[in-house]
Amino acid sequence: MAGEVREWVSSNGKKLEAEFISGTEKFVTLRRTSDGRRFTINLDKISDEDREWVKQKLEEVEGPGKKEPSGIFEDRLNDSWEKMEFGTLKFRFWGGKKLKNTKRYPVVVFLHGRGSGGSDNEKQLFSVPRKLSSKGFYKDNPSFLIAPQCPDDNKGWRGVYIKDVIKLVNESIKHLPVDKNRIYITGLSMGGFGTWEALSIAPELFAAAVPICGGANPSIAKKIKKVPIWTHHGEADEVVRVEWTRGIVNALEKAKGNIRYTEYPEDSGIKHDAWTPCYNNPEVFEWMFSQAKNK
């Protein structure tokens, strides 16, 4: 691990060529090449890129360490959609039996649309959850899948319900071998609105988002502009007007956000059901799973 010479950048932009000697979670020890002086500095004093480099070097030597499922997730890695509860929510959880406690895996959150809410803990598995847990797909994209059910479709993914979704994701980070740099969220219709809402509350939590036929107040654009987002909407949508998505997309483009937009034209036959072409497009998932906050 030691012995590598590279250019380092301080948090205020100053550059230094130095040999990496060692590092910890809080400090890094370097030897300056110009005079051989050795010194230890706080990681807060170097750039984000350099901090991530140190972290990766430490993991190469030490590995991420074992992390057994615990808390509400103990004994829940069963290759099945486990029925669970957290806060105000009932939710389904999928974790593969073969996931290793020495590795870290992404989390995917799916927010359903209106009509799938309630308390049966069943209807929210409509659409993409079954695809993500299918044998072939899951083998190529192992992850922890979370599909919460909104207790009240009339209230939607707002207030305490979306806040509990965020708390649930943090609970998974605490008790599962989660890759904190690869937490994804997607949702359709009411869940599309919920996806935007989650981003506005905790933009630092997510590595990527795929909101479908939803929308958001353009005023949140600056807050969420660093999150990679690929949003979808049908031009002929008669349930949620396409202007809902166009507005936030335009605001993100003006804010120089990381935004990608697919609008299905009127002559495509796609109306509100923009999730079918979206989720049937393998490029969407290739893009989503390739996103990471430490890239």
Language-model segments: residues:
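Compositionally biased alpha-helical segments
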Residues: 1-87, 141
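Short, solvent-exposed loop/turn and secondary-structure capping segments
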Residues: 103-104, 118-124, 157-160, 197-198, ...
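Active-site machinery of serine-nucleophile hydrolases
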Residues: 107, 111-166
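Short, proline-enriched alpha-helix->beta-strand connector loops that line the catalytic pocket
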Residues: 141, 224-229
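Primarily recognizes the serine-hydrolase "nucleophile elbow" in alpha/beta-hydrolase
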Residues: 175, 181-225
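C-terminal catalytic histidine-bearing segment of alpha/beta-hydrolase fold enzymes
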Residues: 212, 228-232, 236-295
